[in-house]
């Protein structure tokens, strides 16, 4: 069940279901269009085995109508006792995942741009223009079997295309800012050394990360690479934050708690105020209003079990709207610590202790390493760690060699 709530009055504006699909992401495309990305495990007689079939849905708050975007559902046909299937969207390859991805929004035409594989025998990765009103799609740009990504501007003009061939090992980036396709980057490798993740506000540069440590840019006219532009010592670049058109809005760093780099200094000051107000927790900026006055933030750690709050920057006021775990009465203390391995390498770790300080002496300890191994534990409300501390244990979550989040040295030390 999805609920759309007015942040000011906390009144429910709409509620709806997206069928049997598992929700993966939810966000606003416009003030009245909510995008829901979901998936479910399916099988298809033309495809061996099962795969996670994903879709994007749009919910119109005014009409209260839920519409599927770029539908690859199978329409079965029988002809001469031969079972045939055709996708509901003409020429769309039926057995593919990742169909919920949106890479652009045209506000004037109320259309979104979605990449997908077309063709049955030799599928190629194209871009479709999809109506938010009807969900109907038309092929907008044609790629090839090696195409893996696209970049467009706000009106749908194609700016760049990324190709990678597993057969030849060629990694290619093409620019179309001049009106014609021009090759601006070429490299041969078993896997791409990087992949562009965002585009600049002026549509002139692509941004990418190197070993998750620093952010670099590539000029779309010449292919010149500049950087490092952003980076913090002892932290990975966790995420390049973008809008729906993949324009870079900020850089989020990892570590024990997140930190951000915004292009606007006032935004940096706002986040600094939030992080200082919740010094023992992780503060994530989940979204911002169009005028940038209201921020939706997620606080998790010693100050809350996953609380969502809205910051009114003009009034300097925080309003709680909901919590992930509303019935949690008390939280065991979460400490960010460092200890030395036998060879002197500093290992960052999370130590969680019982809520009662009187019960923190001579505790048995449980080591709870994360999965991955390319992952890391942070200051957050971890239900399993909290459960174990409530039973009288101390819980240590080490970010061992090979863990991400704390810079290249720690991650590289796990390679042996």
Cite the ranges covered by each PLM segment.
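Cap/lid segment of the alpha/beta-hydrolase catalytic domain
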Residues: 327-416
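An N-terminal hydrophobic leader/cap segment in hydrolases
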Residues: 303-338
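Intrinsic-disorder/low-complexity peptide segments enriched for small residues
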Residues: 103, 316-319, 361
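Residue-level recognition of strand-loop junctions within catalytic nucleotide-signaling folds
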Residues: 39, 300, 352-354
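Generic alpha-helical hydrophobic packing signal
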Residues: 3, 12, 294, 309, ...
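Alpha-helix boundary/capping detector
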Residues: 274-275, 300-301, 393, 414
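Short, charged, solvent-exposed linker or helix-capping segments at domain edges/interfaces
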Residues: 68-69, 321, 361-362
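Beta-propeller folds
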Residues: 1-294, 302-304, 314
């Amino acid at each position: 069940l999805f609920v759309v709530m007015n942040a000011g009055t906390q009144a429910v504006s709409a509620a709806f279901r997206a069928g049997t699909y598992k929700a993966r992401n939810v966000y606003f495309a416009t003030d009245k269009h909510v995008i829901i990305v979901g998936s479910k495990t399916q099988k298809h007689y033309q495809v061996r085995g099962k795969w996670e079939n994903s879709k994007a849905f749009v919910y119109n708050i005014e009409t209260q109508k839920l519409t599927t975007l770029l539908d690859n559902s199978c329409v079965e046909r029988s002809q001469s006792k031969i079972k045939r299937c055709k996708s509901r969207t003409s020429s769309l390859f039926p057995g593919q995942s990742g169909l919920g991805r949106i890479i652009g929004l045209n506000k004037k035409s109320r259309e979104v741009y979605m990449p997908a594989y077309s063709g049955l025998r030799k599928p190629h990765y194209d871009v479709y223009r999809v109506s938010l009103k009807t969900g109907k799609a038309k092929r907008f740009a044609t790629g090839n079997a090696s195409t893996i990504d696209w970049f467009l501007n706000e009106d749908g003009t194609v700016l760049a295309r990324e190709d990678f061939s597993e057969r030849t090992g060629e990694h290619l980036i093409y620019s179309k800012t001049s009106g014609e396709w021009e090759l601006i980057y070429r490299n041969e490798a078993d896997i791409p050394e990087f992949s562009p993740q965002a585009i600049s506000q002026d549509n002139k540069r692509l941004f990418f990360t190197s070993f998750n440590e620093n952010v670099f840019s590539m000029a779309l006219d010449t292919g010149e690479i500049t950087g490092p532009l952003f980076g913090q010592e002892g932290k990975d670049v966790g995420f390049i934050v973008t809008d729906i058109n993949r324009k870079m809005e900020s850089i989020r760093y990892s570590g024990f708690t997140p930190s951000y780099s915004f292009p606007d200094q006032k935004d940096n000051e706002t986040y600094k105020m939030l992080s200082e107000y919740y010094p023992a927790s992780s503060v994530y900026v989940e979204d911002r209003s169009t005028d940038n006055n209201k921020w939706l933030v997620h606080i998790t750690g010693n100050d809350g079990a996953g609380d969502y709050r809205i910051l009114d920057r003009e009034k300097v006021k925080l309003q709680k709207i909901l919590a992930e775990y509303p019935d949690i009465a008390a939280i065991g203390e979460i400490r960010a610590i460092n200890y030395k391995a036998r060879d002197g390498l500093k290992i960052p770790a999370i130590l969680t202790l019982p809520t009662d300080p009187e019960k923190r002496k001579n505790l048995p300890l449980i080591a709870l390493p994360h999965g991955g191994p390319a992952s890391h534990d942070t200051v957050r409300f971890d239900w399993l760690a909290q459960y174990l501390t409530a039973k009288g244990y101390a819980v240590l979550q080490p970010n061992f060699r090979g863990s991400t989040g704390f810079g290249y040295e720690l991650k590289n030390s796990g390679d042996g």
